[in-house]
């Protein structure tokens, strides 16, 4: 992540914390100004449209924390199961956003089944990565990707809205 983008996301995080905890109307106005400045910097640094950056930054409420993405590493007979994303045609491990009220294990079972029709038994977490340190393009949000090694119990792929 380049320094300018790093600083902009830190400014946004500080502004969001201020908006969450401040009661003073003048401070709230200043924190909103900081969020707008952060959005301008992010837009200029990434070539993302300003209104889209603002949509992401201003929809967040509360203290900012990373989003969590879970991915199933399903290996059988030296082959790894990948799914093709309908959105952009790229190949990836089955997975997605972690849902609230589900454990990491429950989330990975759900995602593997939804995206690949795979019934799995999660064995162990093999990696936790900060997405922006390992992927392009950079995302406005901070995302932690949790990779879970899974045993494949059964597979029966069904057409779905996310993968093919």
What is each of the regions a protein language model found here?
Residues 1-12:
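Short amphipathic alpha-helical heptad-repeat segments
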Residues 8, 15, 31, 35-38, ...:
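Long alpha-helical scaffolds
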Residues 15-22:
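Secondary-structure edge/capping motif, primarily at the C-terminal ends of alpha-helices
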Residues 26-28, 32-71:
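Acidic, metal-coordinating catalytic segment for phosphate/diphosphate chemistry
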Residues 54-93, 120, 124, 152:
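N-terminal strand-loop-strand
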Residues 98-122, 130-164:
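Unchanged
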